[in-house]
Amino acid sequence: MADDQRTQDVGARITDEGIERMRARIGVEVPKEQPWNEYATVDAIRHFAWSYGDDNPLYSSPEYAANTRWKGMIAPPTFVHTTGVSVVKEIPPEVREKGKGALAGVNALFAGNVLECFQPVRADDRLIERRVLHSVDVKESRFSGGISVHNIDRQVYLNEQGQVTTIWFKRFIRTERQRASEKTGKRTVERAVYTQEQLREFDEAYASETRRGAEPRYWEDVKVGDAMQAMLKGPLTLSDVVAWMQGSGRAEILPSRLGWKNRQRHPKFYTLNDFGVPEAAMRCHWDDSWARKIGSPYAFDMGNMRTAWHCQLVSDWMGDDGWMWRLETQIRAFSYIGDTHWLGGTVTRKYVDGERRCVELDIWARNQRDEVTSPGKAIVILPSRRHGPATLPAAPPELEERRPNDG
């Protein structure tokens, strides 16, 4: 019986019907059952920043943040994925039926994102999230063979004043687990083992890292070709994954009775582990055995974690007075447990957009195998010696919402 169930766990196929059911979901707002953080409390923001190794006091010290231009603590850009309550409470039954079971039981691998930031998320904010499936495309899969389905989700976050804080597009690639698993044995990936000398080099690298912080980086002082300070992440350990989960959370991963209740609601989210016990399918991030069954030789990191690394690279460079307007990244390869990454970037463009003094950055994350696993671009708005503080960008007006207390 358990063997039959394990076969079902990896045997789901991408079919024409499944693709059409997925397309039926486009534009339908999806309610969130329960955010990890309903409120952006001081502790929630701090714990999120710490979960990926960010020591910026703007995200962790109310006393420090009170003396910045923000007059209080703000959240790192990707904190929003831990929060956001839904206005829509359910999908109409006739709409739900059209998309029922769409591509259930196949991989959904995080492949990249575009993040646009318009307002800071402040301590004690209660955000609303509006999430829809934005697009569905069918492509050939180099990862698993056969076809894959690329879907993009759009998440819009609004504060209690109805202002858009963040628009986030996330790309997922859906592949068949069994096909991907069959190719796993053909992939040769050397797992990292480090010497004491290398560990000392890592310690020295961490000791040398600096943060711009309270010293403004003025637009006039930046030149095309300037290099960003390198930032080290790793070697990645299972403890790092635990730390990430502590701060970023997943409301679906619950123990005991709560886990049982969630399994009744979302049975396809669970597969049998090596002990014959149902466990969350996302354990590929800490369970080598399950990772191999879905097409990866080893357990690997979360895409959102690497996105947070990129945000830290940018915030360390721009300082407290800068504003990251846009971040676009790709996740081209897994970051396995044991991997080490160096993040870096260069200034590729300076320009003026209305009242905003902008800088464009090429950024990347490169592992110990000299693979760029996550390239990207960022647009930063900087303060100006001549024109004053960085001016925040305007969100698309059609996404702003009027609140009852607006008058």
Residue ranges and their predicted role:
Residues A2-G112, R177-D321, R385-G407:
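Hot-dog-fold acyl-thioester-processing enzymes
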Residues H81-T82, E116, R171-I173, M231, ...:
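Residues in well-ordered beta-strands of folded domains
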Residues T165-W168, Q229, S374:
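A structural microfeature
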Residues R171, T175, L327, G344-Y351, ...:
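Ligand-binding pocket scaffold of soluble enzyme catalytic domains
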